[in-house]
Amino acid sequence: MYHVVCATTNPAKIQAILRAFSEIFGEASCHIDAVSVDSGVPEQPLGSEETRTGARQRVINARALRPQADYWVAIEAGIDDDSTFSWVVIESADQRGEARSATLPLPAAILNEVRAGKALGPVMSAWTGIDEIGRKEGAIGIFTAGKLTRSSVYHQAVILALSPFHNAIYR
């Protein structure tokens, strides 16, 4: 059984990680250890590079906190131009996989508040009345009428980031 350290305590992210690992490595193939670590970037990262830096830093911090594991995984959500997206970074003892998620265009009314310095989650909670929406369906769930959720989009990115770990051609 793989010991997977998730650099998050967010249920939407943990669910995506657990589901992806189960699909790639088999049901009950891993034990998740969720830890809260700093990203080293603002609460609402802006741009692809700042967001990826946040995910990479979370992995570094998770490895320092829990050095005995098979995998360390971080998901960092950010804003790029007029959209929200995330970076997934996965590391093992000797390898790294990274993938960027699908992007969701955001309405101007939401973007204006984010550009004024607010994080997307609290802005969406205020607009929808859903407390802690970032730990649930997220903006993705709201704007796709529930067809996708934060977790489902993260799940795809985790699957992509896992590709180097189960395909020999990457080694």
Swiss-Prot record:
Per its UniProt record, the required cofactor names are: Mg(2+); Mn(2+)
Disulfide bridge positions per record: none
| UniProt GO molecular function | ITPase activity; metal ion binding; nucleotide binding; ribonucleoside triphosphate phosphatase activity
Question: Is the Acetylation keyword given for this protein?
Answer: no
**What Enzyme Commission number(s) apply to this enzyme?**
3.6.1.73
For the biological process aspect of GO, one term held by this record is: nucleotide metabolic process
Membrane-spanning residues where? none
What catalytic activity is recorded? XTP + H2O = XDP + phosphate + H(+); ITP + H2O = IDP + phosphate + H(+)
Where along the chain is Mg(2+) bound?
A: D38, Q68
What domain of life does the UniProt record list for this protein's source? Bacteria
Keyword Magnesium included in the entry's annotation: yes
Q: Which Gene3D superfamilies match?
A: 3.90.950.10
What does this protein do, in the record's words?
Phosphatase that hydrolyzes non-canonical purine nucleotides such as XTP and ITP to their respective diphosphate derivatives. Probably excludes non-canonical purines from DNA/RNA precursor pool, thus preventing their incorporation into DNA/RNA and avoiding chromosomal lesions.
Subunit structure of this entry? Homodimer.
**Protein's name in the database:** Inosine/xanthosine triphosphatase
